[in-house]
Regions:
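Periplasmic/ER-lumenal interhelical loops and adjacent helix-loop junctions
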Residues: 93-208, 249-255, 312, 316, ...
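Membrane-embedded helix bundles of polyisoprenyl
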Residues: 2-84, 100-120, 125, 186-187, ...
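Membrane-interface helix-boundary motifs at transmembrane edges
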Residues: 1, 42-47, 85-96, 168-178, ...
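Aromatic- and carboxylate-enriched substrate-binding clefts and catalytic-loop regions
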Residues: 24, 28-29, 67-77, 127-139, ...
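Transmembrane alpha-helical segments
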Residues: 32-44, 72-80, 162-165, 212-227, ...
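Structural signature of transmembrane alpha-helix termini at the membrane-water interface
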Residues: 15-19, 41-44, 61, 79-87, ...
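Short periplasmic/luminal acceptor-recognition loop of GT-C membrane glycosyltransferases, typified by
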Residues: 323-336
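Contiguous transmembrane helix-bundle modules in multi-pass membrane proteins
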Residues: 66, 175-188, 195-317
Length: 336
């Protein structure tokens, strides 16, 4: 039941469905990333260690843009698995095992340099002519719900994710606490997003590879609720405070505020009803409704340009840009 529920949640995450028809390049690497996570499990069990390099290499060759964040997600999951199998970890053992694991990822990067190096050269050579500007105020840490919830250019889950992160941060399990802290830092520190984007801009779409890690915390919390190991009242209060902080900190729209309120009401209602009657299907229905709300909002929030308004053939701006690029000897890039 837990595996089915998580599969449903993963399928209905906002970026997965949206980009499957909008920007396939934002999610086409996901199969290799998931296979990489499975290979990491085998790696720390002493099985087929070469598979980590293989799946990381294929992920990099599939999507160069998500190379940094994809490798970062694999590294975080590697530390998570290492902490899980080592009950008494030491710094010396961590350095030894971490170096051996990092070598597998570095080898994948070296193999993929045939694609990464030309792309990196293009990014660096065209940077001076770019028009991207990052305000220092955007680096101020805060509760940015856009990095986690509803948005199709981010992890794009529901408030249960916030509940899961909070639960993980206060968990007694070292590996789970580590993952919760990592997800919390990613969601509150824009400079991390800026670095994962190659210092180009602060755009949360680079966090999409962390979706499976969010699902992992999702599963831990779901399983704890089923076993009755969570104190829901304090978690509900903290989740509400975090949601309110996100609303007031980033001045969200009325529509987003409505979805946050609806999400919170549905989530808390299903949790407390489940605690009374102990029927697992109630919890599943509540989470499914939250995900459906999130996915529907994310997909309908995108405004497409009507075909009748496009002016590719007669656009003076397009012709001017094409003439300028053609007159330059160095490689150029444009913002999309």
């Amino acid at each position: 039941n837990t595996a089915f529920a998580l599969s449903f949640v993963f399928l209905f995450s906002a970026p997965l469905i949206f980009h499957s028809h909008r920007h396939i390049m934002f999610v086409n690497y996901m199969p290799f990333l998931l296979l990489g996570f499975m290979a990491i499990e085998d790696y720390f069990e002493g099985k087929r260690k070469y598979m980590v390099t293989l799946w990381a290499f294929l992920m990099l060759m599939t999507s160069y843009f998500f190379a940094v964040s994809g490798l970062a997600a694999m590294a975080v999951y590697g530390v998570y698995r290492w902490l899980k199998i080592n009950e008494k970890p030491t710094f010396k053992k961590f350095c030894k095992d971490g170096t051996a694991f990092a070598f597998r990822l570095i080898l994948a990067v070296i193999m993929a340099c045939v694609l990464i190096l030309p792309t990196l050269h293009c990014m660096l050579s065209g940077r001076e002519a770019g028009n991207s500007h990052v305000d220092l105020k955007s680096f101020i840490p805060g509760v940015n719900l856009k990095f986690l919830l509803y948005y199709h250019y981010s992890i794009g889950l529901c408030l249960f994710t916030v509940l899961s992160i909070i639960s993980a941060v206060f968990s007694k399990q070292r590996y789970r606490r580590f993952l919760g802290i990592v997800m919390m830092v990613i969601a509150t520190c824009p400079i991390i997003v800026y670095m994962l984007n190659g210092t180009l801009y602060v755009d949360p779409k680079v966090l999409i590879p962390f979706l499976p890690l969010g699902m992992l915390l999702f599963g831990h919390t779901y399983f704890d609720i089923i076993r009755g190991k969570l104190k829901l009242k304090p978690l509900a209060v903290i989740t509400l405070l975090v949601a309110l902080a996100g609303v007031f900190w980033f001045k969200t729209t009325k529509k987003v505020e409505f979805y946050i309120i609806l999400d919170f009401v549905v989530l808390m209602s299903s949790l407390f009803v489940y605690r009374r009657c102990k029927k697992e299907f109630i919890l599943n229905i509540g989470m499914s409704l939250c995900l459906v709300v999130s996915t529907v909002y994310a997909n309908f929030a995108d405004e497409l340009v009507p075909l009748s308004e496009l002016e590719y053939d007669n656009s003076s701006d397009m012709n001017t840009l094409a003439d300028y690029v053609g007159s330059q000897e160095e490689i150029s890039r444009t913002s999309n």
